[in-house]
Amino acid sequence: MNTLRTAMLLAAMTALFMGVGFLIGGSGGMMIALLIAAGTNLFSYWNADKMVLSMNRAVEVDEKNAPEYYAIVQALAKQAGLPMPRTYLIDNPQPNAFATGRNPQNAAVAASTGLLQRLTHEEVAAVMAHELAHVQHRDTLTMTIVATFAGAISMLGNFAFFLGGNRDNNPFGFVGVLAAMIVAPFAAMIVQMAVSRTREYEADRRGAEICGHPLWLASALDKIARGAERIPNPDAERNPAMAHLFIINPLHGERMDNLFSTHPSTDNRIAALQEMAQQMAGGTQAAPRPTPRQAGEQQPSGPWGQAPQAEQPAEPERPKANPWGRNPTGPKGRWS
């Protein structure tokens, strides 16, 4: 099913490329766009993950320079039956994370320093379990290729203004160029939404199964969403086509309930996880807003053998009591 979905998305993006090419240069422009699309498909398959990691200035870490973070990913990968992915750290105060790679054998997960500093051990585990769920479902290939294509289509639409307005072989003239500038990026955004909004719910569900407790992830989503609203991510702002790769939309000030958001509503995702927690516990009453203390009231079935610590005050400027508050050393020095 994932292979079919990937093929359909590639076909849709290729059709967008060809449509823009036709609007710019008629049948000749369409054929050139087809060749560009074919090259982009091949390049995306082999290199899109490297591009995404590079755009976010992610640095690979291991058990020596990020022992706790690496150990979390290692334990969760074992729990999920996955190969150990390459593990990256993004030097950014906004709490966020993403996964990339063409298959589980070539996957990578990345978390920001803001995520490690602001979330508890259990919440970090839940976030990385969510990312590993994307790897397990092979969403990473689809999402990475779509991100690369969306950026390329947006650039092609912008180039249409300069390249297509006065060409004799442009069958629609300036009207066609305007259509290429407006319709192509919008259509690419629609495809991004089709990928991200449905896959996030499924990754939430599977991630909660991997880490053993849905409320850990619910609490993490709440903290990340509040952090993303007020802490900018300059790298994501420069490359908005990557936004749907992250667990929470990283674009500063983005309204999560917007009709055209790349992510489903955070409140809806939290509600789904609360319902899942009730089902796992066999309860019937509505669950309150999740906290790590509540999550620890029953032993998880995942790789974590003890109850989580109490939640810190909401969105502290500097963490007071979590595993990352002991000044762990990363590739660029101490994180806190």
From Swiss-Prot:
Alphabetical list of PROSITE patterns matching this protein: ZINC_PROTEASE (PS00142)
Bilayer-crossing regions: 7-24, 29-48, 145-165, 171-191
UniProt topology in membrane: Multi-pass membrane protein
Residues at the active site: E131
Named cofactor requirement(s): Zn(2+)
Subcellular location: Cell inner membrane
Main location: membrane
Gene Ontology terms, MF aspect: metalloendopeptidase activity; zinc ion binding
Binding-site residues for Zn(2+), renumbered to this chain: H130, H134, E200
Keyword flag Cytoplasm: no
Segments of this protein annotated with the region Disordered: 278-336
Disulfide bonds: none
Enzyme Commission no: 3.4.24.-
InterPro entries: HtpX_protease (IPR050083), Pept_M48_protease_HtpX (IPR022919), Peptidase_M48 (IPR001915)
Gene3D superfamilies named among the record's database cross-references: Metalloproteases ('zincins'), catalytic domain
Pfam families registered for this protein in UniProt: Peptidase_M48
UniProt keyword annotation of Isomerase present: no
BP GO annotations: proteolysis
Biased composition range(s): Low complexity: 278-287
GO-annotated cellular components: plasma membrane
Cofactor binding, note field: Binds 1 zinc ion per subunit.
Alphabetic keyword roster: Cell inner membrane, Cell membrane, Hydrolase, Membrane, Metal-binding, Metalloprotease, Protease, Transmembrane, Transmembrane helix, Zinc
Family per similarity comment: Belongs to the peptidase M48B family.
Name the record gives this protein: Protease HtpX homolog
The species this protein was found in: Mesorhizobium japonicum (strain LMG 29417 / CECT 9101 / MAFF 303099) (Mesorhizobium loti (strain MAFF 303099))
Record lineage: Bacteria, Pseudomonadati, Pseudomonadota, Alphaproteobacteria, Hyphomicrobiales
Gene encoding the protein: htpX
